[in-house]
Amino acid sequence: MTKIRVHEYAKQVNKTSKEVIEALSKLNVSVTNHMSMLEKDIVSKLNQTFKATPEKNVGKQATQNISQKSQSNGQQNHSVKKQEGQRQQSATSKPKVNNQQHSNSSNEKSKNTKGNQNRNMTQNNNNNNNNNNNNRRGGGGYNQRPKPGIHGGKRRHPKTHQPSIPVKQKELPEKITFVESLSVAELAKKLHREPSEIIKKLFMLGVMATINQELDKDAIELICADYGVEVEEEIRVDITDLETHFEQTEEVNEAQLSERPPVVTIMGHVDHGKTTLLDSIRNTKVTAGEAGGITQHIGAYQVTEGDKKITFLDTPGHAAFTTMRARGAKVTDLTILVVAADDGVMPQTVEAINHAKAAEVPIIVAVNKMDKPSANPDRVMQELTEHGLVPEAWGGETIFVPISALKGEGIDTLLEMILLVAEVGELKANPDRLALGTVIEAQLDKGRGSVATLLVQDGTLKVGDPIVVGHTFGRVRAMVNDKGRRVKEAGPSTPVEITGLNDVPQAGDRFVVFEDEKTARQVGETRAMSAIQAQRSEKQRVTLDNLFEQMSQGEMKELNLIVKADVQGTVEAMAASLMKIDVEGVNVKIIHTGAGAITESDISLAAASNAIVIGFNVRPDVNAKRAAEEEGVDIRLHRIIYKVIEEIEQAMKGMLDPEFEEKIIGQAEVRQTIKVSKVGTIAGSYVTEGKVTRDSGVRVIRDNVVIFEGELDTLKRFKDEVKEVARGYECGITITNFNDIKEGDIIEAYIMEEVKRV
């Protein structure tokens, strides 16, 4: 005997469980309840206490039970034999059916004269003989119908009852893990116990459960605590969501992190010297190889200053590349705003400032073209102060560096300032982990297939790594750095061009490296399938229609607005009025203002910042309309200022009036007019299209010009009022407050349908 429960031991020594527990407490042995297990040495101490030997008593009791059962079985067998003999004797007195039956009955009589020892053997031989006879006859015979009470002529063997041997249970595990929940059966399997035992423990805890019932975390912990088993809940991470991999970088141990180069974006107005500045930094002629001297794509380059590196993204400054500039601002640590000293702040300079502020990226102002006689840096500083960029010399926090990109003056100072800001920002990454980052640009090359320029933001990217990029996947076949040389690996903040993807990703997509190609393939295929099903489902753009819904769900903390008007004075008045809107939970933030038409640049900025565009006395141009439809940007056009304020305030409070859309349901041609006193002019009409209904609105059209719009007064057919008249039928129509109807007029019927807000 190894272990025994308290209540089992109490039963063996004819004691109550309470008495045994009291005896154990006197022996300084702590037990929780009657289900507790007792070790062998504890049982020995209890035996001495109670002066009993439980194991021997159990053995004697088992022997007595077996002897009693065998005696009762013997008596039962004797009575069965006696009854069978009587039945067989009565069976012989029945008339003979055929020789086969006669032989069977005679065999049975002879069997009765033999001892009980050979009864079973004889019975089996008889059955075999019967089967052999049937086989000799070609299977044409039939089995003899069993005698009543004989049960087919087969005798059941008396069962010998043996004492059950207890099955040794497996040892309890030290620790179990689960995800969210476990059923009773699953928990029992993990604990190496029977489900009935778990159900019993749950019942003792006041929980009624079935074998397939799911148990929550608290119930699992209580059961495991009773067994002394440690519990750990596993949290499953959706590896197909690439953003979760970026969130995990925040949980890395500080000891694993090392300093990384800063990623810098150069922004500014057209021809203010962005590419020339980068050209001076790299000492290469990038501008000479570009069409028209304007950068045609996002280029990523890395330069060395002393013993440290700096990564530059040359974001195009032309208005047609506003979207690319918005993407570039999202992956950078620092923005260099290039402003020409002889030109000052221009519209695209303001847009660049707004992009950087929206991305919460620090700005260093590089005042370029200082070598020109007309250079006026004080004017530049004054204009930038109006946009929130106050120089350090004037008590602000913005660093201003005067440079001449063409002559290379001030470049060293600019690089020192970049490294200084980067040092303050404590830019770090873990180079020992699997790489992740962002796509800067991608294209399909005829010779190399899918080519993507990647910026590694964390970890180290190596040749041969299985990679998932956006909704595509592959294996890094080759890597080329910004100097055109092949490399085998790229660390944090390093731009590289890779090949080996099965499709062309989109610029701005995230990329993550996985441990094996199988996982990368599964994740890539899953993401591609979900993208197809959702039809490139993106984050829902905020509109005035869904603003309150997003506020209710806690998705909106700030309402970004872009305000455009016909004159600058109106812009300032609208901006001031909009900033005064006070609704609990959401702040109004105006990220860009300007005088003039709504352009494609405004739509691009709104898409990048999830903003609403408000136009006052201005309209979007063709390109802006198309871009707004593609990006899902909400444009609101108004001519009265207070209506703008009222609409936005009501949207924030969820009180927007429903939208209605006009739907033309039919037309009728006036073929005869009848003037009736006290009624007016009745138009005898013929419905040519659709139908005319009693509750529809109507407009009278004469020579393709609308001369009146109102409501129907009466609609009749043969003096009877009707609800509607369909196409091909004649009717009489009178219009409220309008009698100037002439033959040949067209009466157009329409209804106003409420449009469901999306």
Curated annotation (Swiss-Prot):
Top-rank lineage group of the source organism: Bacteria
Cystines in this chain: none
tr-type G domain ranges (all copies): 259-428
Bias (Low complexity) ranges: 96-136
GO terms for MF: GTP binding; GTPase activity; translation initiation factor activity
Principal location listed in the UniProt entry: cytoplasm
G2: annotated span: 293-297
Record SUPFAM superfamilies: Initiation factor IF2/eIF5b, domain 3, P-loop containing nucleoside triphosphate hydrolases, Translation proteins
The protein's role, per its UniProt record: One of the essential components for the initiation of protein synthesis. Protects formylmethionyl-tRNA from spontaneous hydrolysis and promotes its binding to the 30S ribosomal subunits. Also involved in the hydrolysis of GTP during the formation of the 70S ribosomal complex.
Protein name per Swiss-Prot or TrEMBL: Translation initiation factor IF-2
Organism from which the protein derives: Lysinibacillus sphaericus (strain C3-41)
Gene responsible for this protein: infB
